[in-house]
């Protein structure tokens, strides 16, 4: 009896345990079946991402520079293509879209994508589009088309777009592989802002089960004034044409740049680089021939921030500042007003007794000059004498690089920080750099290293120094305000960080403006270029520069100026690579741009007097 009850008890326990197991399984498979099915479904869903429209780009006056329009595009659902219908679809595409080559068809039907974008069908009428949709594998979706309103104008500022590369995916992780990405200019720099959020076409198997619209990118408002940009581009083209007509050069003169920045804020009003390109050519894919042609003439280089040139005499304002601030004037001169005799050359003795002679650009000399007239007439001898004094006073000690420190204080030798990609820093040479180059780039330096002659080259903007037009504009801005700040293009930038330069005071700024004004008036190197302005020239200032290039290359033409002496608003810098004399080419170009800035009627760019 006891044994039988024990067996009954064990049986009851076993049955209870079995019922519990069955209930648990039932709960998982039946009671939670909705969640289970949902989870299984999710595991079989695939997503194709649709490219979103990019944000619009506007100039400072809300003029549209770049826009995106949605146009119907034909896509093919490759999951509905099989061995039974592939030839039918190939023949259909080949017959109806005759621009498609056999290689295009092979690319389409060998793709691993779910959907493949075949072409824009904006040229088809309603009935033709309906006919396409009767074929099961065809889908029609809106796809954004980028359009650049002003074509080549401001192309280096705006940039262009293209298919993403592995480098793009690394830099912008949210980029979709079937999308587009900014390749240069603000299109690249502000990619995350402009790109938007991709749409989604959700597939279960070969059927579309959900669709999420893409979201447009944010709009971008620039500091650029497109009207000034057009005037600056036209003026630079006129000047380059004149340079080709008046100078003999081994190369066709075609490279140049113009920069106009706000003296107070650093806003970039205009930035031109030539040769340029039409970014619209990249929207549907540029041909290899066209790309190679543009690449050959360096049309994709933004010479305003990537062109590295010796600055020539526009660099003399650095020595001007140093002389004023440190009291470092030529031998026997104790102030800015004292004069020295310039006879057209500077001669001095080496330790071994041999003579070195430096010849000024003006063979018969400038006569009696002080700091003001040395800037006005661009007297090399005056500044060479300052370099010689620095060398003899400081050779071998920590102050030997005092000129270089003043240059770096103005931003030479480092990027300005403008909101554009690929900016270059340039070079401010000194003893340490030459020692480094002796090891790394021995072809650039002499075995004896840094010498006094290198300092004399540097003080007049020659030798190993290289700089960009934007650096020169930024340096002049600092000298004219006493504050340094990065130039910028985004009009809605959160804040502009201004750094006070305590070595630049109001008296210095007043002296500099007055002396720059001498350059554009009687006896100044830019007088002929600005003579057409008459009395208006009394309120304009600048500095010409003619920089020698190595080998058989023609000189580089420079002008750096300000639109008003009494109330400076803009700094203007013009460079023409191999353009010759700064007073003959760059100054007349700048004059026409200044005419626009001050509201004067425009007159043609006229070849100026060759000085320097």
Predicted features and spans:
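Periplasmic/cell-envelope proteins involved in peptidoglycan metabolism and beta-lactam response
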Residues: 1-286, 401-409, 553, 575-612
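Beta-lactam-recognizing serine transpeptidase/beta-lactamase-like catalytic domain environment
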Residues: 64-66, 200, 207-211, 224, ...
């Amino acid at each position: 009896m006891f044994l039988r009850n024990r067996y009954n008890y064990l049986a009851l326990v076993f049955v209870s345990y079995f019922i519990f197991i069955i209930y648990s399984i039932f709960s998982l498979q039946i009671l939670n079946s909705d969640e289970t099915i949902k989870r299984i479904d999710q595991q079989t869903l695939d997503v194709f991402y649709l490219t979103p429209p990019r944000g619009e780009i506007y100039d400072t006056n809300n003029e549209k520079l770049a826009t995106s329009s949605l146009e119907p595009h034909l896509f093919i659902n490759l999951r509905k293509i099989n061995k039974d219908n592939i030839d039918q679809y190939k023949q259909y595409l080949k017959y109806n879209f005759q621009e498609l080559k056999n290689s295009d068809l092979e690319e389409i039907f060998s793709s691993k994508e779910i959907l493949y974008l075949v072409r824009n069908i904006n040229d088809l009428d309603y009935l033709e589009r309906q006919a396409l949709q009767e074929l099961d594998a065809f889908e029609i979706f809106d796809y954004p088309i980028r359009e650049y309103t002003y074509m080549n104008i401001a192309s280096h500022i705006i940039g262009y777009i293209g298919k993403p590369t592995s480098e793009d995916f690394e830099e912008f992780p949210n980029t979709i592989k079937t999308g587009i990405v900014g390749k240069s200019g603000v299109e690249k720099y502000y990619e995350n802002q402009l790109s938007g959020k991709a749409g989604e076409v959700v597939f279960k198997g070969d059927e579309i089960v959900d669709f999420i619209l893409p979201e447009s990118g944010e709009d971008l408002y620039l500091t650029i004034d497109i009207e000034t940009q057009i005037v600056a581009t036209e003026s630079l083209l006129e000047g380059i044409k004149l340079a080709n007509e008046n100078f003999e050069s081994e190369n066709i003169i075609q490279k140049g740049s113009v920069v106009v920045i706000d003296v107070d804020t650093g806003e970039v009003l205009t930035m031109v680089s030539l040769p340029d390109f039409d970014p619209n050519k990249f929207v549907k894919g540029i041909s290899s021939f066209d790309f190679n042609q543009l690449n050959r003439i360096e049309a994709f280089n933004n010479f305003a921030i990537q062109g590295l040139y010796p600055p020539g005499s526009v660099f003399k304002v650095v020595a001007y500042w140093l002389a004023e601030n440190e009291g470092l004037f030529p031998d026997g001169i104790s102030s800015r007003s004292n004069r020295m005799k310039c006879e057209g050359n500077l001669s001095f003795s080496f330790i071994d007794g041999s003579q070195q002679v430096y010849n000024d650009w003006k063979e018969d000399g400038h006569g009696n000059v002080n700091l003001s007239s040395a800037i006005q007439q661009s007297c090399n001898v005056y500044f060479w004498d300052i370099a010689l004094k620095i060398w003899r006073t400081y050779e071998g000690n920590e102050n030997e690089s005092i000129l270089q420190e003043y240059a770096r204080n103005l931003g030479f030798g480092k990027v300005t920080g403008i909101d554009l990609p690929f900016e270059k820093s340039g070079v401010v040479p000194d003893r340490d750099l030459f020692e480094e180059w002796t090891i790394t780039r021995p072809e650039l330096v002499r075995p004896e290293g840094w010498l006094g002659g290198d300092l004399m080259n540097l003080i007049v903007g020659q030798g190993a120094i290289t700089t960009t037009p934007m650096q020169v504009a930024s340096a002049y801005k600092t000298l004219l305000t006493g504050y340094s700040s990065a130039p910028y293009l985004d009009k809605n930038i959160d804040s502009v960080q201004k750094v006070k330069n305590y070595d630049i005071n109001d008296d210095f700024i007043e002296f500099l403006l007055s002396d720059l004004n001498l350059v554009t008036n009687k006896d100044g190197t830019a007088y002929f270029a600005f003579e057409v302005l008459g009395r208006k020239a009394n309120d304009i200032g600048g500095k010409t520069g003619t920089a020698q290039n190595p080998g058989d290359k023609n000189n580089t033409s420079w002008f750096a100026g300000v639109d008003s002496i009494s109330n400076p608003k803009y700094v203007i810098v013009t460079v023409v690579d191999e353009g010759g004399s700064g007073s003959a080419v760059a100054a007349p170009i700048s004059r026409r741009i200044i005419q626009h800035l001050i509201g004067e009627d425009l007159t043609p760019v006229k070849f100026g007097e060759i000085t320097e």
